[in-house]
Regions:
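Short gly/ser/thr-rich secondary-structure transition/capping motifs
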Residues: 39-44, 113-117, 171-172
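Phosphate-binding/switch region of NTP-binding enzymes
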Residues: 147-185
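Conserved inter-motif catalytic segment of the P-loop NTP-binding fold
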Residues: 51, 63, 79-160
Length: 185
């Protein structure tokens, strides 16, 4: 009877497996919306070529040792006086992070951001209204799941953004996860 009323539907190939039908969708009030770019700065003046909007996901893909962390730390340096920034590192502890920050042309005491060690479940720690930098989103198996992982981060954002570093194999044109890594950005 629940199937006939449109409450559930058969799910998968196994007998007796069903799922609740979610018929709700949030309205997009495009008519009353204003266009507010986030005035974020990027290395190489990238902001002159792209407009960053609330809830945007920016993916930075590169092979190992290509400079992804340096790129991410430069974003922090260029924006920390204007925005609250959360930096989630999956590969650096305090000593290495401090060593990298000391290479910049200003005193270590001038750095203003929150650094956290994190290598999984990033959507659980995202700050919805702030800049969230994930350096990097590790994919050790099931690379095809990256699209869902990025989607989970997107769903947590409200007016903030996420900048996500992904590994790429040497010579590859896309990050691990292939086209799935391009679906949300």
């Amino acid at each position: 009877r629940l199937i006939e009323r449109g409450v559930i539907e058969k799910y998968g190939d196994k007998n007796g497996c069903f799922r609740l039908i979610d018929s709700e969708a949030q309205n997009i009030d495009w008519f009353n919306s204003s266009i507010n770019n986030i005035d974020i700065k990027y290395p190489f003046g990238i902001e002159h070529y792209v407009h960053t909007m609330p809830k945007n996901i920016i993916v930075v893909a590169g092979s190992p040792n290509a400079g992804k962390t340096a790129f991410m730390l430069n974003i922090v340096a260029m924006n920390m006086d204007k925005f609250k920034i959360n930096y989630f590192s999956s590969e650096m502890a305090a000593m290495e992070l401090r060593s990298r920050l000391q290479k910049f042309d200003f005193p270590i005491s001038k750095w203003r951001f929150t650094a956290k060690e994190r290598s999984h479940s990033f959507a659980d720690v995202i700050k919805p209204e702030e800049i969230n930098i994930i350096d990097f989103m590790e994919l050790t198996e099931d690379f095809w799941k990256v699209g869902g992982m990025i989607r989970s981060v997107y769903d947590k954002l409200s007016t903030g953004i996420a900048i996500i570093a992904l590994q790429k194999a040497h010579g590859a044109t896309m990050a691990r996860g292939g086209v799935g890594s391009l679906e949300k950005p």
